[in-house]
Amino acid sequence: MAADYEPKPITTEHIVLSDEILELVELLAENAHDIWASERLRDGWTFGPERDDTKRQHPCLVPYAQLPDRDRDYDRTMVIGSIGAILALGFTISHTHSGVDPAP
């Protein structure tokens, strides 16, 4: 790390997420997990009770709903940070209610 590097995350403490956005958070957290899991499976990883980089096994290669709370919370925290930054930067998020099912 460069000695002069000072992280400056966007301030989001003033952002309040609506119930609708919190529903979006959960959908995006699950999607983030699915993207991560798809990449691992594509790279030859399998489920294992403990992480083992040599055997390419990982205990989180399960459906999102089966993840331990701490792992789901990690995904949610990352999504909340991103959505909070989007809103803090003055963008809006709206739902078109198109009826499209988010799952294939």
Language model segments and positions:
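Alpha-helical propensity feature that highlights long, continuous alpha-helices across diverse contexts
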Residues: 1-104
